[in-house]
Amino acid sequence: MAWIIGQKLHNGQYTIEKTLGKAGFSITYLATDAQGNELVIKTLNEDRLKKLTPLRRESLKCKFVNEARRLEGCRHPHVIQVYKTFVEGQFFCLAMEYIQGKSLGNLSQRVLPEKEALSYIQQMGEALIAAHQQGLLHQNVKPANIMVRAGQYQAVLIDFDLGGKFEYPVTVGWQDEVFAPIELQSKTRSRGTFTDVYSLAATLYVLLTGKLPATSSDRQKGKADLIPPKQINSQISQRVNKAILAGMKLEPEARPKSVLDWLKLLGLQRDGVISGLGKKPRWAMVVGILGVVGIVAGVVSASLGGTGFWDNIIPESSPDVNSSTSSPLYLKSPETEE
């Protein structure tokens, strides 16, 4: 059941203004706080959850919470900021910044100069590397999920697919499917940093050509071929053309293994280090620790189906997505159905 306009959340701290969108198993709302500031609240979509078996539903909730916590710990100028997490009824929620500006989805209706497009791609590459270091995949990279702040050239990556596509692939529209590699449309194929590489390369393809590439599923079935972007826009440099094709290789093992490797193919490294990366500053570590403490204090007991879901908190290592730089508390997922 969706929250209605005017509904109060988190002991009256937030007021729902409208529904912003639904993607995968999540739903996002525009809300205001007590001072009238706008923010985004993201949680799981109860209507979609009802279509899952009880065991898969609990597993998805665990994954959503764990990945939400990783996103909260990802402090980076090009990653959407999570203000806080809280529990409303039976659902875990994220209160996030609301970004004033336009998405690259609006800009992709025109062909961007290569230099401008690469500037946005480097920013998104840095954002993804920061997320991957937290053990978090995005799995939904596309122009519409890259916001450019009003009056600036600063891009921000939004709408992380928390828990959804990783184990529960869903039917997507064709315009979204062109950014999805084959492993995102399968329940059995492994995902990794190379998954986001494909989507970021496809995003650059669209920004430089104004055209949508053939979908990975059509290419796999032999129904279509991937047209090299330089054949569409002759102004694209040979180096960028080759990097896009490398990032959009059909089979995961044929792609660059990490976003950093792919950015190097584009020639975007700076003295061997991508800007904005490196050793995490001390203040960021403190923020991460305080975030974990806040989560533990804020997560209250809520019973689902007679089981203490929110009490099921145990230490767990981050998944092997590159390497995690933090070790917060996570929810233990129930056994997966055979």
Residue map of PLM features:
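Conserved short submotifs of the Hanks-type protein kinase catalytic core
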Residues: 89-103, 107, 111
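Activation segment signature within eukaryotic-like protein kinase domains
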Residues: 120-121
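C-terminal lobe helix-coil module of Hanks-type protein kinase domains
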Residues: 178-268
